[in-house]
């Protein structure tokens, strides 16, 4: 979010003032040269304005919750649908990785607020293609189930049946602080959004698992949802708060009541075997096998490197002690590193950084051996 100003109020620093200065400067020359200078200056000004607009127009990143079936529809054949949205609207748009056993994925869309709003409105249209009002599915993950009832003819008497069938829903993911900003004092803002754009808006009671985010369900015609998202973006950017950044975001993951139900994490890197990630009592866990010969380099002198990694990722990293020679070691070539954390993304970050450090050490060793 590079700027919190309304795009309509953006000042254009290179404009009439430069042209007037140019005109007054050229008073001492012929009228022909004045005209030439002015046209060149105007052309230069236009280029500067376009450049400044591309830099200063506010940007935003919205996240939408989708089911696996909806995700497949958004991606399209060989990624054609999502690529089309990306190219038409000039946005960065993508989906979170599939997590084993999870029925949901998160769609992220970042760019200029107008482009993001149009993109998500287009996604609503894509999801409604070939479906009807009564074709809603039921999901075990209740956040995917609609909160609002389907639209009826009584509510939209001025619309045809075909138009009513185009009414769709967007599950916008917002943090608790963002939701308060959208609702406004005494619910004034959300009421204005509903009435002005003729949409229904409701927030989920529950927070998404292990996060400070809730679902803001918006129901309406795609164009209406686009306009609502544009207004919501402006509200959030104008009330940008430090608490927005510190609130926990939701990432698809399994929750389990016993260690036997595990979430598979990333595949191995550089020959390192990655174990399962168990979620139990609000704690995520990742287990890595690091080759014994690299443990010292990964841990650092007096454990400083691993200590810095713990601090940076806000995780607990436990290095398994070397087994006594009198005990039979089932895996003498590798040492186990266990990563524990309260947040899934922190554990994933620590895991990826450990693997990256290992890759660096492997390359260093290869270089040294090549020089000998």
Curated annotation (Swiss-Prot):
Which GO BP terms sit in this record?
chromatin organization; mRNA transport; regulation of translation
| Organism from which the protein derives | Zygosaccharomyces rouxii (strain ATCC 2623 / CBS 732 / NBRC 1130 / NCYC 568 / NRRL Y-229)
Task: Give start and end of each KH domain.
Answer: 59-123, 167-232, 283-354
Give the subcellular location. Answer: Cytoplasm; Cytoplasm, P-body; Nucleus; Chromosome, Telomere
Compositional bias of type Low complexity: which residue ranges? Answer: 24-39
Task: Check the record and name the PANTHER family matching this protein.
Answer: KH DOMAIN CONTAINING RNA BINDING PROTEIN (PTHR10288)
Where is the major localization of this protein?
Answer: cytoplasm
Q: Name one GO molecular function term.
A: RNA binding
What gene, per UniProt, encodes this protein?
HEK2
Question: SMART domains given for it?
Answer: KH (SM00322)
GO CC annotations, alphabetized: chromosome, telomeric region; nucleus; P-body
Give the protein's recorded name. Heterogeneous nuclear rnp K-like protein 2
Which family is this sequence assigned to? Belongs to the HEK2 family.
Q: How does it assemble?
A: Binds RNA.
Identify the keywords attached in UniProt to this record, alphabetized. Answer: Chromatin regulator, Chromosome, Cytoplasm, mRNA transport, Nucleus, Repeat, RNA-binding, Telomere, Translation regulation, Transport
- Location of the region described as Disordered in the Swiss-Prot/TrEMBL record: 1-49
